[in-house]
Amino acid sequence: MQGVRITILWCIVLATIYAEEGPSTPRDDDPVIQKVRGLRNAGMKANDERMFKDAIEKLRHAISLLHNRVFGEERAAIKDPTVISQDAALYAQILNDYGSVLIRTKQYDEAIEVLEDSVAMIEKIYGDSHPSLGLSLRSLADAYMEKKAFKSAIKRYKTLRKHVKKGLGMTHEAYIEASLKIAEGYKKLNKKDTSRKVLKDTLKAQGGEINGLTIGIAELYMELSSAHVEVGEIDDALRAAETASAIFLQREGKDTMAYAFSLNALAGVKMQQKKVDEAIDLLDRAHNIAVSIYGENDRITLASAKTLQDVKDHKMNLLAAKDEL
């Protein structure tokens, strides 16, 4: 769910990049550029339809055509510096698209190589303040994360966060999402104290009045609750879990899986407090939401039913043990 929101956010950023291209120019009528854009659009459509082999083939063709214009024999025929810059920018953009498809097909090494090139080209063309740099950095960091190269992923997410901070500020959802990824990376490296510090510092950076409707804030509290539980800070975990649940309720609504997941997390804290009845009530509410959305036999619903039953069984065992005393 979080991953979907991140994707939507960066799609908006990408739309901004397209909008900056401005009005039609003679270059737009160039047959090579038209063919490249057609291949790019067809490739991304195939990607959306999970036809990855077709998507890769079309994007590789587009890259090959543009590579010849940017680096090959056709470069000598192009004299206008603006056109040269636009060609290079389009090349970097399609490299990013191609890298994203490679990530989806788990071809991480090639994805990283392609996306490193995309980042380098954008920095050379625009410097470190262009929106398209953030898009490529995010894709590159994601590729490292998927490859389980967590140190490299953290480094790139930090660069991305610095880029976002400079352009959008620390209260923007993109800054929060990058911070969540950094914290996740440290958690994967078993650096739990560092992960928790990243989460707390990000929350502190939001200032005195936190906007709970900002995407990422509820998720931030949820992760912070989990981090507190891991080190036995149960009171802090409860406060964070309650805040996350309240925000999800306000932001997503009472009949959503986001809210249901927050109830599950809150139930976990209640179990740490040995408040089993309260945990059962929360899990029952979460399960009913899942049933209303997916029905009785969905994988998610069956999992929530099992969790609920396990806790009920735990309660019965506690009662039985008490009766034996």
Curated annotation (Swiss-Prot):
Membrane spanning stretches: none
This protein's record includes keyword Secreted: yes
Residues annotated as signal peptide: 1-19
Main location: secreted
Protein's cellular compartments: Secreted; Host cytoplasm; Host nucleus; Host nucleus, Host nucleolus
Ranges of the TPR repeats in the UniProt entry: 37-75, 92-125, 134-167, 218-251, 260-293
Keywords linked to the UniProt accession: Host cytoplasm, Host nucleus, Repeat, Secreted, Signal, TPR repeat, Virulence
Disulfide bonds: none
SMART domains, alphabetized: TPR (SM00028)
Residue ranges of the motif RxLR-dEER: 37-75
Stimuli inducing this protein: Expression is up-regulated during plant colonization, 3 days after infection.
GO CC field: extracellular region; host cell cytoplasm; host cell nucleolus
The protein's role, per its UniProt record: Secreted effector that suppresses pattern-triggered immunity (PTI) in plant host.
Domain remark in the UniProt entry: The RxLR-dEER motif acts to carry the protein into the host cell cytoplasm through binding to cell surface phosphatidylinositol-3-phosphate.
Family membership: Belongs to the RxLR effector family.
Name of the protein in its database record: Secreted RxLR effector protein RXLR-C07
